Amino acid sequence: MFLTNLTLTNYRNYEYETLNFGEGVNVILGENAQGKTNMMEAIYVLAMAKSHRTSNDKDLIRWNEEYAKIEGRAEKRSGSLTLELLISKKGKKARCNHIEQQRLSQYVGHLNVVMFAPEDLNLVKGSPQVRRRFVDMEIGQVSPVYIHDLSQYQKLLQQRNHYLKMMQARERSDEAVLDVLTEQLVLLAAKITLRRRQFLSLLEQWAMPIHYEISRGAEQLCIRYEPSVDVSEKAELSRIVEAYSETFAAMREREVQRGTTLVGPHRDDIAFFVNGKNVQTFGSQGQQRTTALAVKLAELELIFSELGDYPILLLDDVLSELDDFRQTHLLDAIRKKVQTFVTTTSIDGIKHDIIQEAAIYRVHSGSVTAPS
């Protein structure tokens, strides 16, 4: 798939901009703080209906304006696609092929993207929350049902935590209410756990050979899912439900004392091992970067295997973070098969011929000069 057109209205520092893109590599060139990353973010938001940089949608709206709008046209193997996302202080409205989507979970997945930015190097060395967010966003692109289940889980989790806090303060003591909330939470938690495990198993299958090649045959990558309940790697949904039910029962007294839910997908983690050692704890910076790069390239292949279309790749100021060998491997891997957007302050340090042949868009103060 590839994005043929992007139109921004009142988005960040863009008042109005409309651009056409080629199927290959598109370089967004400019000094810092001119709007390069804002454009990359806009493409990401168009696809995912949320930003990777902020959780506050108001940040996306241009100063002193009431709304921001992102519009895009794309070509997929299944046909043409038009997308529109309106962001106001009241919320978001999304349209796909001019049809308003009742829920954002219906909208996400029509356009697929993989973002690789400097902060994605924290995928390995960052907090468990970073890794959970990564997994959830990627599964959501290929499974709208997962987005719905995750949203329902988060709402129920808030309700359960609120009730636990009231029980902690002795404002409520009805165990039956907690039983109902727990029972509803258990099934959703089990579904999320099962889907995460399946996704990470597939991701590992794609990432292992990529990592082996980038490390020039010196390293073997293993991705381990660490759920908050003790279940075997081959456990079916019914067994995962049992495990959650048993664990919640055992933890109830502690949860009431703490006033919060101590078990569930919101406490999962993912660990990356290279040659049997945890990369987060024992890996060098080079190993951490190789692992992050291998995972990002594996995402491309996994989405293609699931959907039959390669996603759009967004490389936001990340090439400068990679050495020449990793740069070359990344750019060779995407050649002629993945539409790619690259932001950089200069192309001089990028020697690969794929960049030299790219379409160059120059950004200055929220205005873009397209290639002639």
From Swiss-Prot:
Compartments where located: Cytoplasm
Residues annotated for ATP binding in this entry: G30, E31, N32, A33, Q34, G35, K36, T37
Lineage top rank: taxon: Bacteria
Pfam family, one: SMC_N
An example Gene Ontology biological process: DNA replication
Main location: cytoplasm
HAMAP family: RecF (MF_00365)
Protein purpose: The RecF protein is involved in DNA metabolism; it is required for DNA replication and normal SOS inducibility. RecF binds preferentially to single-stranded, linear DNA. It also seems to bind ATP.
Name under which the protein is recorded: DNA replication and repair protein RecF
Organism (species): Geobacillus kaustophilus (strain HTA426)
Lineage, top ranks: Bacteria, Bacillati, Bacillota, Bacilli, Bacillales
Gene: recF
